[in-house]
A protein has these predicted regions:
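Hydrophobic anchor at the beta1->P-loop junction of P-loop NTPases
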Residues: 11
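A basic- and aromatic-enriched beta-loop-alpha substructure that forms the phosphate/nucleotide-
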Residues: 63-126
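Conserved substrate/cofactor phosphate-moiety recognition/catalytic segment
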Residues: 24, 28-71
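Conserved glycine(s) of the Walker
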Residues: 18
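A glycine- and Lys/Arg-enriched "phosphate-lid" helix/loop adjacent to the NTP-binding pocket
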Residues: 102-196, 213, 221-222
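Phosphate-binding P-loop
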Residues: 1-6
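NTP-dependent small-molecule kinase module
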Residues: 166-258
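P-loop (Walker A) phosphate-binding loop of NTP-binding proteins
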Residues: 14
């Protein structure tokens, strides 16, 4: 493979597989610009200040998906016009995250009783959500075929960080990982699964692309980890500043919203 043939590179994977660290490090390592699209947690602080990801209603989750899609398309278009990019995920992610929620329920990262209530009250709306996601998927697949050249998929290799801020569970990760890889495989574009440490992943990607590097891999990984850590701390500070008391009344209110 030659880097000249692949201008629009996707680092793919489900939640907490290392997409952001890998895409940031690859950008530093190669000098190829990275798509700067906001994370889901950032978008939640913008659209729904004071709310936790796992408390979002199905309508709010759809709005979140639309907003992330909008930001991603805008950022990718700018860099595409400038010669190419490295993408942290793709337009397929929000679609697959939605289809997985049809199987796990809309709030897989919440408490057991919250999930039981939410899964029950959203059941009548499932046929509509399925039709909506089918239409979303048609659009996402078409755009992915037209706007990406190669996918590097990061599988689920380690458990999520138990920091209490993850909006999903391990079952959700396993299902969405399988669905995402299947969706990518059907596009017709090259897809390569890369495993191992951040350094091993980068070595595999650079070797497959056959492109020059501008710094040492270990340095790129170290700098990327610091960038990601600082970014997450800023988002967490915003979340804390917006946080509201999670009273029993509030818990019941959010659990019973469709």
């Amino acid at each position: 493979m030659s880097g000249n043939n692949y201008r629009r590179i996707v680092i793919s994977g489900t939640y907490s597989t290392g997409k952001t660290t890998t895409s940031t490090a690859l950008s530093l390592l190669t000098g190829i610009p990275r798509v700067d699209a906001s994370s889901a947690r950032e978008v939640v602080t913008e659209l729904y200040p004071g709310m936790r990801f796992q408390d979002l209603s199905t309508t709010e989750l759809m709005a979140l998906g639309f907003r992330r899609l909008e930001l991603r398309i805008q950022a990718e278009a700018i860099l595409d016009a400038q010669g190419g990019f490295i993408a942290d995920g793709s337009v397929l992610n929000e679609w697959i995250y939605g289809t997985t929620r049809l199987l796990t329920g809309p709030n897989p990262g919440s408490t057991r009783w919250h999930k039981a209530v939410k899964n029950t009250i959203t059941l009548p709306g499932r046929p509509f959500y399925r039709r909506y996601l089918n239409a979303y998927g048609d659009m996402a697949r078409q755009r992915a075929r037209q706007n990406y050249d190669i996918f590097f998929h990061l599988p689920v290799e380690v458990p999520m960080d138990p920091d209490g801020h993850r909006p999903v569970d391990e079952r959700y990760r396993a299902i969405s990982d399988r669905q995402l890889l299947h969706a990518i495989s059907e596009l017709g574009q090259p897809v390569v699964t890369v495993r191992g440490t951040p350094q091993q992943r980068l070595e595999s990607i650079v070797s497959m692309l056959d492109i020059p590097t501008v710094m040492d891999i270990d340095v790129a990984v170290k700098e990327a980890m610091e960038i990601v850590r600082s970014s997450r701390e800023r988002v967490q500070e915003t979340i804390i500043a917006q946080q509201q008391p999670n009273t029993l009344r509030r818990k019941i209110k959010f659990a019973t919203r469709v």
